[in-house]
């Protein structure tokens, strides 16, 4: 893990852990999604719009928007680049709060809220259609395990990284 990645995880992890106490969304899931969706905070969406999660700005969204390109997989095989309008925020904290609010307000994400097993949470968010990538759940699980993100889920969590020998010095 690079120092930059470590700092990203620590920054988003603090926000996600605090948010988990209010929302019931596992911090490890939130961090993994932020890593995957924002490219470690380097995507144009994140740099210009503080958007960590690539949430599209639907017709009900009244906040700021950012136009950007994204990859969508409509047939389960082929990825297509499309341009869309995405939600933009004043800060990463606002992005994390809106992410959990989106999950909490939409019935399709009901299985994610309060789930304590990170693998089940990853499967649930993918099954609910958060992303079009058919390998989305597996990618999230791999990120959580590679970077031992369940440490942010708090004591007493049923979630345990399968590679419990993962250390901060591990590179990937």
Q: Each predicted region: which residue ranges?
A:
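Catalytic cores of secreted/periplasmic lytic hydrolases that degrade extracellular macromolecules
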Residues: 1-172
């Amino acid at each position: 893990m690079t120092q930059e990645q470590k700092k990203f995880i620590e920054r988003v992890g603090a926000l996600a852990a605090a948010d988990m106490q209010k929302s019931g969304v596992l911090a490890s899931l939130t961090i993994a999604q932020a890593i995957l969706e924002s490219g470690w905070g380097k995507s144009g969406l994140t740099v210009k719009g503080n958007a960590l999660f690539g949430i599209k700005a639907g017709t009900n969204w009244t906040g700021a928007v950012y136009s950007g390109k994204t990859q969508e997989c409509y047939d389960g095989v082929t990825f297509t680049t499309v341009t869309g309008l995405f939600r933009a925020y004043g800060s990463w904290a606002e992005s994390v709060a809106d992410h959990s609010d989106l999950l909490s307000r939409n019935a399709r994400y009901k299985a994610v809220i309060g789930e304590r097993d990170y693998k089940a949470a990853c499967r649930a968010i993918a099954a609910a259609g958060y992303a079009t990538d058919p390998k989305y759940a597996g990618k999230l699980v791999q990120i959580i395990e590679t970077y031992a993100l369940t440490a942010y889920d708090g004591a007493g969590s049923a979630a345990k990284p399968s590679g419990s020998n993962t250390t901060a010095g591990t590179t990937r």
